[in-house]
Amino acid sequence: MNILPENTIFVVLSFEGPDAYSMAGGLGARITYLTQTLASMGFEVHHIFIGDPHMSKVEAREEGRLTLHRWCQWISEYHPNGVYDGEEGKLYDFNESVPPFVVHGLAAPAISQGKLIAVLGEEWHTAEAISRISDLLHYEGLRNKAVMFWNTNNTYGFERINWARLSYAITITTVSKYMKHIMRNWGINPLVIPNGIPKEILGEVDEAHVMRLKGLIDTDFIVSKVARWHPDKGWKPAVEAMGRLRSTGKKCVLLARGGIEPYGGKILKRAQSIGLKVRDVCIQRRPLDEDSNAIGEDAFEPYFEALSHAGTGDILNLLFPIPHSFLKVIYRASDVVLANSLHEPFGLVDLEAMATGAVVFTGCSGEDYAMHLVNSIVLDSFNAEEVKFYIENLQAHDEEKKGIQAAARETAKQFTWDKVVRSLLRKLEYQTEVQQRALT
């Protein structure tokens, strides 16, 4: 069966979503791009998520093809600090109320019109709900008219999942071969459907912005790193590599954007203990388009001002949210983007940086797309000496660097959301055939 807008309706379940209240990390962005892409292809899509309590319960977007269903708003009213504030209460309500709504309010009417229902769940929070939806569809005699995928991007919450029940009822997917092998240890053999990046990231970066950023940083070599302050994210080898480069007389600056995690203080103290000068960089006024990704001189001016007032340092600690539009400028201006995580289920930051033509240093876990010295530098260890070696190697081999930059951009083009969704559709079609054969 071909899955087409005329014969299929999508129902997507997640905790995170497109609202600022609902956006806590990469999942919010992933699910927003996924639903938007499906809708842009003509599909009717219903996205059920923990929404902002002060926004409308139901909202139509993408010319009516995408319907947002903001769930648990009555609970979120008492928990203003985002999607995971009051998590357990929201989870209970989600599990109790979403399944009957999906089956009776969305699936049954669509199936009565001869349509297929594709239900997609994201992360451990939706594992129970999607299992209950399957049970209820079966009870109503409708299960054979639905294809159901549940996806995980990480191992968070695995201990709370009833794997036997979930894998019996639902097709399980994940985002990389690395995650597939991890999940085999749990007795699960998932399908692999990669993550994606929006096409807009592939747009050209204004070289005037890039040159201005470079001119504000007094160095011969710019390294950037954007990640949570966490031991697995490779901050320690990153700062120690900077220290070793400095000790050889090389002039390098690390642009560091972490989170609010206390581990950041430990890393910055470590940097200072090996002789690195750390400068905190704050913006003095709010950007005009902070909540959008608008590109313009005025929108970027607060960031340029902040960097111009930072003074000289070996590490510039960026203490402000950075929109994708300005991140692209940082990546493009960087000689190296460090994405050297010990455990990286997919590596979305890596791909976003590669889309700008940056040379990315990846880890060697979930970055299936990374090819050493072809489109990136794939690090084999968590060793600062390896980071230092390849930085020096790039400085000495400019033609090789240019080749990596060109290949990186071409690689990123293969992972735009429209291509990822095509892969998803083919796997849904395959699973639909498997289900139909099982019934005959």
Give the predicted meaning of each segment:
Residues 358-363:
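Short hydrophobic beta-strand element within catalytic cores of glycosyltransferases
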Residues 2-10, 37-117, 264, 278-314:
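A conserved catalytic-core segment of Leloir-type glycosyltransferases
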